[in-house]
Amino acid sequence: MRRKTLKYLTFFLLFIFLTSFVLNYSNTGVPSAWFPKQMLLELSENFRRFIKSQPCTCRHCISQDKVSYWFDQRFNKTMQPLLTVHNALMEEDTYRWWLRLQRERKPNNLSDTVKELFRLVPGNVDPMLNKRLVGCRRCAVVGNSGNLKDSSYGPEIDSHDFVLRMNKAPTVGFEADVGSRTTHHLVYPESFRELGENVNMVLVPFKTTDLQWVISATTTGTITHTYVPVPPKIKVKQEKILIYHPAFIKYVFDNWLQGHGRYPSTGILSIIFSIHICDEVDLYGFGADSKGNWHHYWENNPSAGAFRKTGVHDGDFEYNITTTLAAINKIRIFKGR
């Protein structure tokens, strides 16, 4: 990243020097006094346009088009991952699809719920998610697979700009293998766990009640049960609460999963979320362990892999998506030691 940025800056400075030399010492008749002000402004604008035309300063930029037809057919850079006051109005077909995900009966009015929600939590996109003009944002998406055990990936994971985790994943006691840093943690009410003070909670709402739960959990604590008991109160700073856009869930389902499963898992939602906000993405803790077992790294689960047979998510198809992304050099997958 630094080498590529340095190359751009060197090119820019060299261009200024050569232009200045030509204007001051040739017989063009252009006054040298004109150069410092007007020419610098034009050069600065041209350089800004040049940099803006580059997806990033990484060696491989995820959003670079015309690298893979398969990727270009699925990736829509105009899709906004987070719900805000500016994009909260959903198309009717998207809204009806979302309501069917968990067959919610008599849902509250979504518009009223969103208005109440954004009186409590930020209504604008997390400024950290806005990509810089020049740079390379490296992100680690840490899954919950048992293949993280004894991997010693911890320091490598922590070296990324963003570290995304999901659901009930703990770090305390597992730092050597999974790292200790978390910048964004994706959860839904039934999978919530206490988060660190500076961690951004990204709520993935599968029903209107999930949005109401955020309101309740940060105020009155009246919602204690959905289809299972949920925490009545949470210790998360309101400015650290972000909402995954329901329309983005449908985008993942339509464009990436092409209708496989009932709806996307938190894992694939985290991955597609990351390729929209990051320039480089590394996956850790996805897939089975070396013995072919599917279980969480923090537990010895006698029924490992049972979740793959529920029919809610198509785990095999989702895993094929991740391996294809890796095969075309859009992401990297670290499968454990």
Swiss-Prot record:
Entry comment on modification after translation: The soluble form derives from the membrane form by proteolytic processing.
Disruption of the gene: reported phenotype: Knockout mice are deficient in CD8-positive T cells due to increased apoptosis. This is associated with a reduction of naive to memory T cells ratio in blood and peripheral lymphoid organs.
Residue intervals on the Lumenal side: 26-337
GO MF annotations in UniProt: beta-D-galactosyl-(1->3)-N-acetyl-beta-D-galactosaminide alpha-2,3- sialyltransferase; beta-galactoside (CMP) alpha-2,3-sialyltransferase activity
GO BP terms in the entry: ganglioside biosynthetic process via lactosylceramide; memory B cell differentiation; N-acetylneuraminate metabolic process; negative regulation of activated CD8-positive, alpha-beta T cell apoptotic process; protein glycosylation; protein N-linked glycosylation; protein sialylation; sialylation
A GO CC term attached to the entry: Golgi trans cisterna membrane
Cellular compartment(s): Golgi apparatus, Golgi stack membrane; Golgi apparatus, trans-Golgi network membrane; Secreted
pH influence on activity: Optimum pH is 6.4.
Presence of the UniProt keyword Secreted in the record: yes
Pfam families named in the record: Glyco_transf_29
InterPro entries linked: Beta-gal_alpha2-3_sialyltrans, Glyco_trans_29, GT29-like_sf, Sialyl_trans
Swiss-Prot/TrEMBL catalytic activity: a beta-D-galactosyl-(1->3)-N-acetyl-alpha-D-galactosaminyl derivative + CMP-N-acetyl-beta-neuraminate = an N-acetyl-alpha-neuraminyl-(2->3)-beta-D-galactosyl-(1->3)-N-acetyl-alpha-D-galactosaminyl derivative + CMP + H(+); a ganglioside GM1 (d18:1(4E)) + CMP-N-acetyl-beta-neuraminate = a ganglioside GD1a (d18:1(4E)) + CMP + H(+); ganglioside GM1 (d18:1(4E)/18:0) + CMP-N-acetyl-beta-neuraminate = ganglioside GD1a (18:1(4E)/18:0) + CMP + H(+); a ganglioside GA1 + CMP-N-acetyl-beta-neuraminate = a ganglioside GM1b + CMP + H(+)
Pathway: Protein modification; protein glycosylation; Glycolipid biosynthesis
Predominant subcellular localization, coarse grouping: Golgi
Function (record text): A beta-galactoside alpha2->3 sialyltransferase involved in terminal sialylation of glycoproteins and glycolipids. Catalyzes the transfer of sialic acid (N-acetyl-neuraminic acid; Neu5Ac) from the nucleotide sugar donor CMP-Neu5Ac onto acceptor Galbeta-(1->3)-GalNAc-terminated glycoconjugates through an alpha2-3 linkage. Adds sialic acid to the core 1 O-glycan, Galbeta-(1->3)-GalNAc-O-Ser/Thr, which is a major structure of mucin-type O-glycans.
Protein family according to the UniProt entry: Belongs to the glycosyltransferase 29 family.
PANTHER family attached to this UniProt entry: ALPHA-2,3-SIALYLTRANSFERASE ST3GAL I ISOFORM X1 (PTHR46032), CMP-N-ACETYLNEURAMINATE-BETA-GALACTOSAMIDE-ALPHA-2,3-SIALYLTRANSFERASE 1 (PTHR46032:SF6)
Protein name: CMP-N-acetylneuraminate-beta-galactosamide-alpha-2,3-sialyltransferase 1
Organism this protein belongs to: Mus musculus (Mouse)
